[in-house]
Design a protein with these regions (language model features):
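Conserved active-site tyrosine of GNAT-family acetyltransferases
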Residues: 32-37, 106, 133
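Short glycine-/small-residue motifs
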Residues: 137-138
Length: 148
């Protein structure tokens, strides 16, 4: 059983409704943009201009890459920095139809997997570490798994 989401468009910026952009604080925007392009086939929409960050489209999400920095008027107490690779508090989760095929393809393109795919909790999953230390979960649900 699949779950269908009704939305007419996933444009950025959205003309109606909502589109989600995942913001990653990275050490090197060029390196990170090229990584997501090479490994996962992300489409680089813009590399930014020094004032605006790069935007990428990856499957049904948008990604923003930025080097971060100190507080700004709209976030006066927040500093953005790359993560400590061993203490992560959020991560992307890629749901795939064929985890073994993705594992082989992405590994051949330079993805650094923490482990091979492992069966766990109604799915098979594994994790990738990107150049800045973020982890990305890759998971395939078992055929009998039900959403919702």
């Amino acid at each position: 059983m699949s779950v269908q989401v009704e939305q007419k468009s996933y444009e950025m910026p959205p003309r109606e409704g909502i589109s989600i952009a995942y913001f990653l604080t990275v050490a090197d925007v060029e390196r990170s943009a090229r990584y997501y392009e090479k490994v996962f086939g992300a489409r680089i929409l813009t590399m930014g201009d020094g004032n605006a960050p790069p935007y990428l489209q990856l499957a049904n999400i948008w990604m923003i890459l930025n080097v971060g920095g100190g507080p700004t008027p709209d976030k006066p107490t927040v500093t953005l920095s790359v993560p400590d690779p061993n203490h992560i508090n959020s991560f992307m989760n890629f749901r795939v139809a064929d985890i073994q095929a993705c594992y082989k393809l992405w590994k051949s393109r330079g993805a650094q997997f923490i482990t091979e795919p492992i069966p766990k909790y109604g799915e098979t999953r594994c994790y990738i570490r990107d150049p800045d230390g973020y982890i990305i979960e890759v998971g395939q649900s078992t055929p009998d798994f039900k959403y919702g």
